């Protein structure tokens, strides 16, 4: 699924910030 993958990417960005 692309949705969970997108959320994972956003989560990684949030942790980076």
Swiss-Prot record:
Q: GO CC terms on record?
A: extracellular region
UniProt keyword annotations, A-Z: Amidation, Amphibian defense peptide, Antimicrobial, Secreted
Q: Which residues carry this modification: Phenylalanine amide?
A: 17
| Tissue specificity note | Expressed by the skin glands.
The listed locations are:
Secreted
Entry's Gene Ontology BP terms: defense response
Q: Gene encoding this chain?
A: psn6
Q: What is this protein called?
A: Phyllospetin-H4
Coiled-coil residues = none
Similarity remark: Belongs to the frog skin active peptide (FSAP) family. Phylloseptin subfamily.
Q: Per its database record, what is this protein's job?
A: Has antimicrobial activity.
């Amino acid at each position: 699924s692309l949705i969970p993958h997108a959320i994972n990417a956003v989560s990684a960005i949030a942790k980076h910030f």
